């Protein structure tokens, strides 16, 4: 943001010019704290709160962001459930897989598999799980899709594919 634009924003938003910061679109949400620190947001907030300021050590965070943007490895994991058309239903599972990937310098790609779609015996599971290095069956409720989950568990067991079952997924 140009200095003139900052002055205009400060004037019409009733804030100090120094408190007008640029908020760019980030490739990953984890880069936002680094961008805000670069703009001096931490110092601005602490000054407004009349608190002492000392620069934060963001070295570990920077390393994490680098791993996210430049992973050394890639892996595909199948998530088998009945709500895969609404991936937000499995948000905690998705985030856990991505965080595990970050910790292991790996980009985790998720293959969403509808458990109801694989219930029939004529569905070729080797095609469904092609390239998957792990199968995860999350929790769920009711009987719908359970047979597909059981087939996924059996396929993982018989083909030595790492498997993680959560809640109902472990009971299958």
Regions found by a protein language model. Name each.
Residues 1-172:
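N-terminal beta1-alpha1 cap of cysteine-dependent amidohydrolase-like domains
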